[in-house]
């Protein structure tokens, strides 16, 4: 469940504190009513430097971005975070699903931090994390490299297939072939 309104409010706070910031909200409209509420909110807050892109070629568009933001209320393993990391872009996410693990790794992972994680629907925390991300190009580059390294190590197609095969073998050994 996406929470674009919190992102809009957080960006409004951020843009009142920092100059030359822009927010691009990527993707098509799944819920017309919610989209209309978001457009109305942008108009009500009189935000000028926010763009709703509609559907775009993510790979091409990623080159224009300094970092990405995911403000979901509920999530499993968000593909958008992995896409961001593949493009060497750090992320600001809400603490849902496996976002924290994607950003910080799991035990034994020494790739480093790849972004900031904030509680869902916490606009002040989100604005602060966005501001920290905006403040340092060097930090963004370092975090982007960390995310890309983590993605290459754990989420490449070949590795995923290998991990699933390993899991199936373990299940087969424990419960027999008929169970699979």
Please state what every model-predicted region is.
Residues 36-55:
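Nucleotide-activated donor-binding/catalytic signature segment of Leloir-type glycosyltransferases, i.e.
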Residues 1-13, 33-36, 124:
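A conserved mid-protein helix/loop that constitutes part of the nucleotide-sugar donor-binding site
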Residues 132, 139-153, 163-166:
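A short, well-ordered alpha-helix in the C-terminal region of glycosyltransferases
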Residues 90-93, 97-104:
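Short hydrophobic beta-strand element within catalytic cores of glycosyltransferases
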Residues 22-36, 52:
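Glycosyltransferase donor-sugar binding loop
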Residues 50-62, 121:
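Conserved active-site histidine-acidic residue motif and adjacent donor-binding/catalytic loop
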Residues 73:
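Aromatic "clamp/platform" in nucleotide-sugar-dependent glycosyltransferases that forms part
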